[in-house]
């Protein structure tokens, strides 16, 4: 599918995918329900409100004056540490920001000047924390030890604590597996807490706890046990370690009394051979009664997932006009690059849903069909052969839902692509959903028999962008490809001033026009921004705040930090020095080795400084050495050892520097490097074997 872009310039006007030009006064959506608790001067919840709209109605910062935005204050929460990334989005009440760090510290920070009012430690090791909840005078936080804490909002003192994920919760082998994850949500005397661990065989569950005492009010098991609805979608005892974890926070409709929770993929994540069936409630959104945890309805977006396509992004609630009728919808998705827009009361697909036949592999027990919603995807659903993010050569490629077995198959958007877990924003002024997306290939194989999942092929390019999608039609209004993947926590905040904010892996926070998506202001924060900006007001002055600390995915070399920033009109705090941006390619991380020989099909023994003694056709690092550094003019010899059992061939890709041809065991090929550069190459026969040569 040809990439379609929305192009808007100073003189071009608003030209989109068949969408008329909009003005500042355009209002194309019904009045939204006030029951979600829309943010005013506060931003009291991660994603702003119970509907996860990530919209602030504050309007003093506008498209016309945003150029005057500057740093109001800046604080390094962890003393300037660059050792850890940060995924926590702040929440704000009465001029105070509350935020966690990966180092398991919870902070209360004065929103005027950045002064730390209190700090409470809830653990000693590092763990992903994505946001606290506020309610009943308390701050609720999870910890790496699977303890939920209630802290006094004024002092940070511990009010109560509750241990979760214990062996006595369940008689399944996965009952004690996993760790708490996702932002905490507070509503009507309960707090809602999720967990992660599907890649390790945890059995997913969602918790509701009494906010006053910490007692567990209910638990919803997402891999149902015997006698429970959905257990028959798991073969044998596979439900016991079935995964299906809720690692992102839910949305809540107070009027319907429903919690909308999304659940991850099943376990094993890329091998379906032992878990025949649809595997409910993996890859599903489930509407649960807020007070009891009773299932009201569910929708599964991927049956029997073997691609790590868990559409776990926090769902968004909105009211939209569809066929001249106001519909209360939940927007769900989407790594697969398309949204599932469902009726909040019934789960009905408001734009229709078609179960389409998909490619099959009997060994993987693949589902015969997969659901496709009415509308159009916001990213392509097949590899982009002519683009920078084209697949690494020699891999098999396929469209969405092409199965794999012993050899990797590249699909697109991959497990880190589409809209992964960046916070969406629903803008009541335009009526659109805004999403940051990734353009990333995945190349999974079945991990049995010593095979390894390549997941993201080495040497491939990462990219991404932002899209605006009209939920009334489930079609993109505009799509803007950019240089960075923006799918991993890079939340979008929209505001009443018609300005939206989003940060990127390079540390730059952008302000954009909410109609065109054009960048109208930028600021360097000092570390990758993989959280969502928030907005609040003190004494009539509007602030924007964000925590910049980086994230390990999809860029392992992203600049990390602990920078909490606030901005206001006329702010005078200068931007941070620009950090070294991450590599736009999935880089080889092995240390550089000097020499003039590369041995094919062998893993480098770093302790002896020699190639391994056995052939390896499945490992990504089966080039010895995997990272070679040579001077211009050096001749490098590529060798297929005589005791290897297979032919090999080393071919540089994207740069077209060398091609050894097929080398039988005992053969070699020499190539002289005449120009400096970085050259990735892989094996034309066993493509996951990948190396890098840097010529200086």
What are these regions (language model features)?
Residues 92-94, 99, 417-517, 521-523, ...:
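C-terminal substrate/ligand-recognition segments
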Residues 321-355:
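Phosphate/diphosphate-binding loops
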Residues 40-47, 83-105, 125-148, 176-205, ...:
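Repeat-blade elements of multi-bladed beta-propeller folds
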Residues 29-81, 85, 115-122, 157-166, ...:
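Aromatic (tryptophan-biased) beta-strands that constitute blades/sheets of beta-rich domains
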Residues 535-578:
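Blade-level signature of beta-propeller repeat domains, shared across WD40, Kelch, NHL, RCC1
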Residues 5-24:
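N-terminal export signals
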């Amino acid at each position: 599918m040809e990439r379609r872009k929305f192009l808007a310039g100073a003189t071009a006007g608003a030209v989109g995918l068949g969408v008329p030009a909009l003005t500042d006064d355009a209002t194309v959506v019904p009045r939204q329900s006030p029951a979600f608790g829309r943010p005013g001067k506060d931003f009291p919840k991660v994603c702003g409100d119970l509907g996860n709209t990530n919209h602030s109605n504050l309007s003093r910062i506008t498209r016309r004056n945003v150029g005057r935005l500057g740093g109001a204050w800046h604080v390094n929460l962890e003393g300037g540490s660059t050792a850890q990334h940060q995924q926590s989005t702040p929440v704000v009440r009465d001029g105070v920001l509350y935020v966690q760090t990966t180092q398991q510290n919870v902070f209360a920070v004065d929103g005027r000047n950045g002064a730390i009012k209190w700090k409470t430690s809830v653990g000693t090791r590092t763990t992903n924390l994505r946001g606290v909840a506020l309610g009943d005078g308390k701050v609720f936080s999870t910890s790496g030890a699977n303890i939920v804490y209630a802290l006094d909002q004024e002092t940070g003192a511990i009010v109560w604590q509750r241990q979760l994920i214990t062996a006595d919760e369940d008689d399944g082998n996965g009952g004690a597996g996993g760790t708490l994850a996702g932002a905490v949500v507070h509503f009507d005397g309960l707090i809602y807490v999720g967990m992660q661990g599907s890649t390790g065989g945890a059995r997913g569950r969602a918790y509701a706890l009494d906010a006053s005492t910490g007692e567990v009010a209910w638990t919803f098991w997402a891999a149902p046990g015997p006698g429970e609805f959905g257990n028959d979608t798991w073969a044998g005892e596979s439900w016991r370690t079935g995964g299906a974890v809720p690692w992102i926070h839910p949305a809540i409709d107070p009027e319907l009394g429903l919690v909308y929770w999304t659940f991850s993929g099943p376990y094993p994540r890329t091998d379906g051979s032992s878990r025949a069936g649809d595997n409910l409630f993996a890859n599903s959104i489930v509407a649960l009664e807020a007070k009891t945890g009773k299932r009201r309805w569910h929708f599964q977006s991927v049956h029997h997932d073997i691609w790590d396509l868990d559409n776990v992004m926090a769902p968004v609630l909105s009211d939209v006009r569809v066929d001249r009728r106001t519909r209360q919808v939940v927007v769900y998705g989407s790594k697969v690059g398309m949204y599932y827009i469902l009726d909040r009361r019934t789960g009905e697909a408001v734009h229709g849903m078609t179960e389409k036949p998909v490619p099959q592999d009997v060994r993987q027990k693949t589902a015969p069909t997969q659901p496709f919603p009415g509308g159009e995807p916001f990213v392509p659903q097949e590899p982009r052969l002519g683009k920078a993010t084209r697949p690494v050569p020699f891999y098999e490629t396929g469209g969405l839902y092409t199965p794999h077995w012993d050899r990797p198959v590249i699909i697109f958007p991959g497990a880190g692509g589409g809209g992964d877990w960046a916070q969406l924003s629903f803008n009541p002024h335009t009526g659109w959903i805004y999403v940051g997306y990734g353009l990333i290939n995945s190349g999974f194989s079945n991990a049995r028999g010593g095979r390894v999942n390549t997941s993201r092929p080495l040497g491939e390019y990462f990219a991404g962008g932002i899209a605006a999608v009209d939920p009334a039609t489930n079609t993109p209004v505009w799509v803007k490809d950019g240089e960075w993947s923006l799918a991993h926590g890079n939340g979008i905040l929209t505001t009443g001033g018609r300005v939206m904010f989003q940060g990127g892996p390079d540390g730059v926070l952008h302000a954009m026009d909410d109609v065109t998506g054009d960048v109208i202001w930028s600021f360097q924060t000092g570390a990758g921004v993989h959280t969502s900006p928030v907005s609040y007001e003190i004494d009539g002055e509007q602030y924007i705040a964000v925590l910049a600390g980086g994230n390990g995915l999809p860029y392992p070399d992203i600049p990390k930090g602990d920078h909490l920033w606030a901005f206001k009109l006329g702010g005078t705090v200068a931007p941070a020095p620009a950090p070294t941006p991450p590599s736009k390619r999935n880089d080889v991380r092995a240390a550089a080795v000097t020499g003039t020989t590369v041995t094919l099909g062998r893993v480098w023994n770093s302790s002896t400084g020699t190639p391994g003694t056995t052939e390896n056709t499945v490992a990504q690092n089966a080039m010895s050495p995997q990272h070679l550094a040579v001077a211009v003019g050096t001749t490098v010899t590529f060798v297929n050892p005589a005791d290897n059992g297979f032919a090999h061939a080393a071919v540089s890709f994207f740069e077209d520097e060398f091609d050894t041809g097929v080398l039988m065991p005992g053969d070699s090929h020499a190539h002289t490097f005449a120009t400096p550069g970085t050259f990735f190459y892989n094996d034309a026969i066993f493509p996951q074997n990948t190396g890098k040569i840097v010529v200086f």
